[in-house]
Amino acid sequence: DESIEQNIIFSAMQTNGKFLKKIGWMRLYDGAAGKSHAEEMVKTLDIRCTGIKQPAGALSGGNQQKVCLARALTLEPDILFVSEPTRGIDIGAKKLVLEYLAKLNREQGMTVIIVSSELMELRSVADRIGIISDGKLACILKPDDSDADFGLAMSGAWKGGRKDA
């Protein structure tokens, strides 16, 4: 059961060489950089813990979800795919996570693709919402399209062809 710090930084360290310092021919873990980044992610995503050395498995499900998000964000992807990013997270933290994802898109140009069963959450942050019905893309709607359009699309009764936003 690895610490919160290791859960957040390990993938980026292994795949991108982040948090490593070169000493001669060796590359060693830069503990100060890793610790600083992990602490920043804990603060940014409001991960409720006793500290970054706490085992991630000891956290609540919602806080474990935020650690997973922190790990993905540490990789600094151009495109971030997240599935149910607010599942198990308390209401206040849901807003924080969604606003942070929107901020990454707005300020860093990161494309964020969210798969979610929470339509109201999607409508609060997305600029386009693709509706999948019977395994096919039924339509693409704008967040401010009518509830009736969303209802028809989600029920599989959409007859208007693709409504691309």
Regions found by a protein language model. Name each.
Residues 1-59, 141-143, 147-159:
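Conserved P-loop NTPase catalytic core
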Residues 109-115:
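Conserved H-loop
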Residues 122-124:
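A short, surface-exposed alpha-helical micro-motif characterized by mixed small hydrophobic
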Residues 74-78, 84:
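A short, proline-enriched helix->beta-strand linker immediately N-terminal to the Walker B motif
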Residues 128, 140:
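Short, glycine/charged-rich "phosphate-handling" switch motifs in NTP-dependent
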Residues 83, 90:
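ABC-family nucleotide-binding domains
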